[in-house]
A protein has these predicted regions:
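Alpha-helical substrate-recognition element adjacent to the catalytic core
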Residues: 3-115, 159, 168-260
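Glycine-centered loop/turn motif at secondary-structure junctions
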Residues: 71, 103, 125, 144-146, ...
Length: 308
C-alpha cells in the first residue's frame, strides 16, 4: 500500500474531506470488464497499455468538480478530495494522468492493492466516502462514516454551476428509529408516534456529520450568493413533518429546500431540483432516481437488513 501526499501539510482538520474511489470518479467500465473476465494480471497489463488514454468522467465527477471549485470561490482550500482506490499505484497511474488532464486539484491518494481502503478514512479525516464497491461502503458505514454506493445510470450532468445535493431523511440524515415503527406497525402507528414525539429530536443518522460540515461551508458564503444548495427529499408528510423541522432546528442545521412528498415517487422531484447527487437508503428509490440524477445508495438501517 502506498499513500501519496504524505510529505504535504498534515493538518486538514478545517476542511470538508471527500474520499472517492477511482470508479466513482472516472468511467473504468472497460478495464473492469477485463478484471472480471481475465483477472488481476490481465487488468494490470491493460491499464499499463492504456495509461496515456484519458478516462471519461464517471458518475460522481461533476460533484467532485463543483466541490473543488468552492476553494477558488473562497480563495482558500476548504474542500479536500482524496482518491482511495483498490488499484495499486502501478495500475493507478492512468487515474492520476486523467486527474491531471481535467485539472482536478487532487494530490492525496491511497492505493491499497486489491483491499478495502476504508481503514484509511479516519486517518484522512474523511467526512464522506463514495465508492462503487458496496462492501467497502458498508464497512465504512459500520465504522461510523457517511458513505454511499454510487450507482451508474442514465443521469445527465446537472447544467447549473450551483452545487446541489439532495438527502433522504430517515436512515440517512436521521436514524432509522421512525422507519422501524413504520415497517413494523404501518402508517397509522408511524404517524401516531411522530405526533407524540414531535418535540423529541430524532437521533442522528450516518449523514448528519457530513450535512453539518456542508452547512458550515455554506455559511462562509453570503446568503444571496451561496453556490451550495441542499434539499431534504422525504416520503414523510404532515403530521410527521414537525419532528423533522424541530430536529434540524435543534441541531442548528439549515436545509435550503424541504420536500415532504407523502409517498410520491421522488425521481421527478430530484430531476426538478437538478441534484448533482441524491442520497437515499431505499434501493427502490435509488433505482428510479439513478435514471435522472447521480445517485448514492446508503445501505444503512432496517430497509437494508436481511429479512428475518
Amino acid at each position: 500500500m502506498r499513500v501519496l501526499g504524505e510529505n504535504m501539510a498534515k493538518n486538514i482538520d478545517d476542511k470538508l474531506v471527500l474520499a472517492i474511489s477511482s470508479r466513482a470518479l472516472f468511467d473504468l467500465s472497460e478495464s473492469h470488464k477485463v478484471y472480471l473476465s481475465s483477472g488481476v494480471e490481465a487488468y494490470r497489463q491493460y491499464q499499463i497499455e492504456h495509461e496515456d488514454e484519458i478516462l471519461a468522467p464517471g458518475d460522481a465527477f461533476p460533484l467532485v468538480e463543483k466541490l473543488l471549485s468552492l476553494n477558488s470561490r473562497l480563495g482558500r482550500a476548504r474542500v479536500e478530495v482524496i482518491l482511495v482506490s483498490r488499484n495499486s499505484a502501478d495500475t493507478g497511474l492512468r487515474v492520476f494522468n486523467s486527474i491531471h488532464h481535467y485539472g482536478l486539484a487532487i494530490s492525496r491518494a491511497a492505493f491499497v492493492g486489491g483491499r478495502s481502503p476504508y481503514p484509511y478514512l479516519k486517518a484522512f479525516g474523511c467526512d464522506l466516502f463514495l465508492s462503487t464497491h458496496a462492501e467497502d461502503v458498508r464497512a465504512a458505514l459500520d465504522a461510523g462514516f457517511a458513505a454511499a454506493t454510487i450507482l451508474s445510470g442514465g443521469a445527465s450532468r446537472a447544467a447549473s454551476d450551483e452545487l446541489r445535493i439532495a438527502f433522504d431523511g430517515d436512515a440517512v440524515i436521521f436514524s432509522d428509529e421512525s422507519e422501524r415503527i413504520y415497517q413494523s406497525g404501518g402508517l397509522e402507528a408511524f404517524q401516531a408516534k411522530e405526533r407524540e414525539a414531535a418535540r423529541e429530536p430524532l437521533r442522528g443518522g450516518p449523514f448528519k456529520g457530513f450535512l453539518a460540515a456542508l452547512n458550515l461551508l455554506q455559511r462562509e458564503f453570503p446568503d444571496d450568493d451561496c453556490p451550495i444548495r441542499t434539499a431534504l427529499v422525504t416520503a414523510r408528510s404532515a403530521p410527521a413533518h414537525e419532528r423533522v423541522i424541530r430536529t434540524l432546528r435543534e441541531w442548528d442545521i439549515r436545509l435550503d429546500e424541504s420536500l415532504f412528498l407523502g409517498g410520491l415517487t421522488k425521481s421527478a422531484f430530484l430531476e426538478a431540483f437538478a441534484a448533482d447527487v441524491s442520497f437515499d437508503d431505499q434501493a427502490g428509490h435509488c433505482e428510479l432516481a439513478r435514471e435522472v440524477v447521480a445517485t448514492g445508495h446508503v445501505p444503512h438501517g432496517i430497509s437494508n437488513e436481511p429479512p428475518i
